[in-house]
């Protein structure tokens, strides 16, 4: 079986796809990827072939003034880029899995439709499921997508002999999307009919921590992790400054993740250490708590490690209410949610005191034992099954 895995999004959107590709290859399938150029090195690290498509997602990797692939002003270019690059990558494939940016997903599904092979759209958080939206919201998304890039999509579809399509939001997501999220952290609701929950897609990380980080960890009390991942809006640096001040006020040391915002330490104090690319699976087992943005991946890794969390709402995007995982952490009793995008020192200090209380730490340890790690295996088996059922008939 040969599978094409595609996506256009942040590191948090992409890492699960890499995990699935690696697992498929372990099971004997041939997996290849189409991703933005940001992820060439990551795919090379795990030995998965990748075709780079379009412009970089990370602001620091783009030219000054160059718009991101999600900008409305460049959406027709994004559609053209994906229709241009996907055909060569999808040739000979038996199935396609995608996530992320809708214009790219619609192009990918069109190619799968042309070949008559299974297409699966994946979301990483239940609040992104179509079933979680009202009909009015879905109508709005469909109308907006059709207006912004419907003509471009249908022009490219016509060029490969496909009929026009409308309601592009529904078309890209399908009526049976996959949810690649752990059922404890992200349970389905009764209204999520048709959704297939596979469990989270996690790639075991065996990379050692750097000697410098090991020395810092060994040199004093257990630190608190502060990081905001792929968030790079101006408020991210301010949120990090507030978090550092709050942790210092508690008398604890800090490991700061540089992230896509290129965060820097406020001074050269010996109580802080900054990291770039790092094995969070290993690091989270060595810290007292994690202060982070509302991220599916970071939240899950902290839960698996059994450490308390302080999750800041709306750091990533203050327009879209990105607060699902912050609220789930609070509901599960494994941490505290605080309002962003720039929380106050007082709110963070109070949250840190609460999160480090014995009952929260005990609850975090208990919940860690319930987190599954077999999501990629479940998804791979679903693909094997789909290919055997939906494989197109070859004319005699």
Swiss-Prot record:
Devancoaminyl-vancomycin binds at residues 127, 133, 141, 169. InterPro entries: EryCIII-like_C, Glycosyltransferase_28, GlycoTrans_28_N, UDP_glucos_trans. Pfam families: EryCIII-like_C, Glyco_transf_28. DTDP-beta-L-4-epi-vancosamine binds at residues 10-12, 207, 230, 277-278, 293-298. Pathway: Antibiotic biosynthesis; vancomycin biosynthesis. It comes from the Bacteria. GO terms for molecular function: hexosyltransferase activity; UDP-glycosyltransferase activity. One of its GO terms (biological process) is carbohydrate metabolic process. It is an enzyme of class 2 (transferase). It catalyses: dTDP-beta-L-4-epi-vancosamine + devancoaminyl-vancomycin = chloroorienticin B + dTDP + H(+). PANTHER family: STEROL 3-BETA-GLUCOSYLTRANSFERASE, STEROL 3-BETA-GLUCOSYLTRANSFERASE UGT80A2. Belongs to the glycosyltransferase 28 family. In A.orientalis different glycosyltransferases are involved in biosynthesis of the vancomycin group of antibiotics. GtfA, GtfB (AC P96559) and GtfC (AC P96560) are involved in biosynthesis of antibiotic chloroeremomycin, while GtfD (AC Q9AFC7) and GtfE (AC G4V4R9) are involved in biosynthesis of vancomycin. This is dTDP-epi-vancosaminyltransferase. The lineage of its organism: Bacteria, Bacillati, Actinomycetota, Actinomycetes, Pseudonocardiales.
């Amino acid at each position: 079986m040969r599978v094409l895995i595609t996506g256009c999004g942040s590191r948090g959107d992409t890492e699960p796809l890499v995990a699935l590709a690696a697992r498929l290859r372990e099971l004997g399938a041939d997996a290849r990827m189409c991703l933005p150029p940001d992820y060439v090195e990551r795919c090379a690290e795990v030995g998965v072939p990748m075709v780079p498509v379009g412009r970089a997602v990370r602001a620091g990797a783009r030219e000054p003034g160059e718009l991101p692939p999600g900008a409305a002003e460049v959406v027709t270019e994004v559609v053209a880029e994906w229709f241009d690059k996907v055909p060569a990558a999808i040739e000979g494939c038996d199935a396609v899995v995608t996530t992320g940016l809708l214009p790219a997903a619609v192009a990918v599904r069109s190619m799968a439709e042309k070949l008559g092979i299974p297409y699966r759209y994946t979301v990483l958080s239940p609040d992104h499921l179509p079933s979680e939206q009202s009909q009015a919201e879905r109508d709005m998304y469909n109308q907006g997508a059709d207006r912004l890039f419907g003509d471009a999509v249908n022009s490219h579809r016509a060029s490969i002999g496909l009929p026009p399509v409308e309601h592009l939001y529904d078309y890209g997501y399908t009526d049976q999307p996959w949810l690649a999220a752990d059922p404890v952290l992200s349970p389905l609701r009764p209204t999520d009919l048709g959704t297939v929950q596979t469990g989270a897609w996690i790639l075991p990380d065996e990379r050692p921590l750097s000697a410098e980080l090991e020395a810092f960890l060994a040199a004093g009390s257990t630190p608190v992790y502060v990081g905001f991942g792929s968030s790079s809006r101006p408020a991210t640096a301010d949120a990090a400054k507030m978090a550092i001040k709050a942790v210092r006020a508690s008398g604890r040391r800090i490991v700061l993740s540089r992230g896509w915002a290129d965060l820097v330490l406020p001074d050269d104090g010996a109580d802080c250490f900054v990291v770039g690319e790092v094995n969070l699976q290993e690091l989270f087992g060595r810290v007292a708590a994690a202060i982070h943005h509302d991220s599916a991946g970071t939240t899950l890794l902290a839960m698996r490690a059994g450490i308390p969390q302080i999750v800041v709402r709306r750091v990533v995007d203050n327009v879209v209410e990105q607060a699902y995982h912050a609220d789930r952490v609070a509901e599960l009793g494994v941490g505290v949610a605080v309002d962003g995008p720039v929380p106050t020192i007082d709110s963070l200090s109070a949250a840190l005191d609460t999160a480090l209380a014995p009952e929260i730490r005990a609850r975090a340890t208990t919940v860690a034992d319930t987190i599954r790690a077999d999501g990629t295996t479940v998804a791979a088996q679903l693909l094997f099954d789909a290919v055997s059922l939906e494989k197109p008939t070859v004319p005699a």
